[in-house]
Regions:
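Active-site-adjacent structural segments surrounding the nucleophilic cysteine of cysteine proteases
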Residues: 1-68
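Intrinsic-disorder/low-complexity loop/linker signature
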Residues: 10, 64, 70, 93-94, ...
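Short, well-ordered strand-loop elements centered on a beta-strand within folded domains, enriched
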Residues: 41, 69-73, 127-134
Length: 155
């Protein structure tokens, strides 16, 4: 769970500031507590370690940014969730449509809102936003839910 941490916090890695919304959704859904300076440092370390392990893609073409296709993307949802965020879940690998009914066995739901770009948030089973890494982002305020990612409990 994030306490007092926003995606725009300057102590976070710039790549998290720009592309870390889904990553921060994992942190919010986690039973671990990320708070203050220590929490931001822990998140930066997790991002770096997960990138080294290939769970998150890095600067693929080595041009010094993460704005190219396939960069700063979570590639192994299950490993990231379980190894770094203590979430005992399994991603089904599907981008579910916004109008699909969420099964009762789903433990965690992340939604992708779209308006001038995409932004991930944590949803409850009624599809209401329970966490937005920017607080009240323009994408959520002005956009619409395009798809969902479902994570099932492992046990």
């Amino acid at each position: 769970m994030l306490k007092g941490i926003r995606q725009s916090d300057k102590e976070l890695l710039p790549v998290i500031n720009d592309y870390g919304c889904l990553f921060l959704c994992f942190a919010q859904a986690s039973p671990l507590i990320f708070e203050g300076k220590e929490g931001r440092q822990a998140l930066n370390k997790i991002w770096s370690e997960a990138t080294k392990k290939g769970y998150i893609s890095g600067d693929i073409n080595h041009d010094g940014d993460y704005d190219d296709d396939g960069e700063a993307e979570i590639k192994n949802h299950n490993a990231l969730a379980n190894e770094f965020f203590a979430l005992d879940v399994r991603y089904d690998g599907t981008h579910h449509k916004a109008d699909e009914k969420i099964p009762s066995k789903v433990k965690v739901v992340f939604g992708k809102y779209v308006w001038k770009g995409g932004h991930f948030v944590v949803l409850n089973k009624s599809k209401a936003v329970t966490f937005d890494s920017f607080g009240k982002s323009n994408t959520v305020q002005n956009g619409k839910l395009e798809s969902m990612r479902w994570y099932y409990a492992n046990s």
